[in-house]
Amino acid sequence: MAGTADLPLEMRRNGLNPTEELAQVRDRDGVIPVGELYGAPAFLVCRYEDVRRIFADSNRFSNAHTPMFAIPSGGDVIEDELAAMRAGNLIGLDPPDHTRLRHILAAEFSVHRLSRLQPRIAEIVDSALDGLEQAGQPADLMDRYALPVSLLVLCELLGVPYADRDELRDRTARLLDLSASAEQRAVAQREDRRYMATLVTRAQEQPGDDLLGILARKIGDNLSTDELISIISLIMLGGHETTASMIGLSVLALLHHPEQAAMMIEDPNCVNSGIEELLRWLSVAHSQPPRMAVTEVQIAGVTIPAGSFVIPSLLAANRDSNLTDRPDDLDITRGVAGHLAFGHGVHFCLGHSLARMTLRTAVPAVLRRFPDLALSPSHDVRLRSASIVLGLEELQLTW
């Protein structure tokens, strides 16, 4: 697996586990300074209770003050363009703007509303498994299964043409790649907005029953066109790679724990608890976006000056012994309540129900279809580390 020594501390992994250094920061210090971010002091926060407290307190820890779209060094992004990019960007908003948009979206992401997609998710998974089997072995689970399943589910929800899947996959990877330059990210952002703007225009002209059509009908009613473009982009960006990575990494983790893979196949009661445990244990989103301390605050005995940024480490927090016993052990029978893989508070992941539905279908299905599933002995497992979301370059499997 690829090394991560050159990455920020919160992104470094020892395989699928926190590095010893990150674990020590959590257990010994709780909070440490990590230089500057956006020209202000920054602090890494690692303990479960402290991270949860930050998520719960949007009055003292602001998302709106984080420059989510930095102007590239070339200086060719004008302020009007940045304003359009920021509009509707839920992760970069505080109440009341965040509350207004969240209220518009909440009903469409309820468990009841999303349950209508469950039969289609099962069809998508079965079809992808057929394709994987027909491809012959060894086969790349990410390319043949995890990425297409995740993307097609989102396309079904939103009304995005699946024919554009290669373009969508490529652009999502570029937007999440922290090794890309500011100019490269700006190019990807522009491409993304142009594409999403075309979809929104089409939905306004011929609104369907998908999420894009439903929301297009609400433009002008407390929702702007720029906001809808950003919302659809964020749903696609936030839901595609994260769910695909969770599928691939969950299968990898269970292959390393065959007795637990067997339990997930044989006992339906283990599926829900198992997915919750895998969400906690893997924490594919290394951290959440930095938040700015609006006033001076104390965290774990450390003074955080007003105007400083805090970086909440999801991986460290979800492996905290204050959350669960033996936190570094994978145990699909425990199903820990309260993990922070989807965040907490007003920014709790809007798509958590859809992600859970997809994972509860896709992960056990591949294990059932291929009971002799194994890592290909002729291929190394390579993690995609320099990304906001931990992923796999590929996962070559035999059966």
Curated annotation (Swiss-Prot):
UniProt xrefs under InterPro entries: Cyt_P450, Cyt_P450_B, Cyt_P450_CS, Cyt_P450_sf
UniProt GO molecular function: heme binding; iron ion binding; monooxygenase activity; oxidoreductase activity, acting on paired donors, with incorporation or reduction of molecular oxygen
GO cellular component: cytoplasm
Subcellular location: Cytoplasm
Inducers of expression: During the interaction with host plants.
Entry keyword set: Cytoplasm, Heme, Iron, Metal-binding, Monooxygenase, Oxidoreductase, Plasmid
Binding positions (heme): C349
Cofactor dependence: heme
CDD domains listed in its UniProt record: CYP105-like
E.C. no: 1.14.-.-
Role noted for this protein: May be involved in the biosynthesis of cytokinin phytohormones and in host plant fasciation (leafy gall).
Sequence similarity: Belongs to the cytochrome P450 family.
PANTHER family, A to Z: CYTOCHROME P450 YJIB-RELATED, P450, PUTATIVE (EUROFUNG)-RELATED
The protein, known as: Cytochrome P450 FAS1
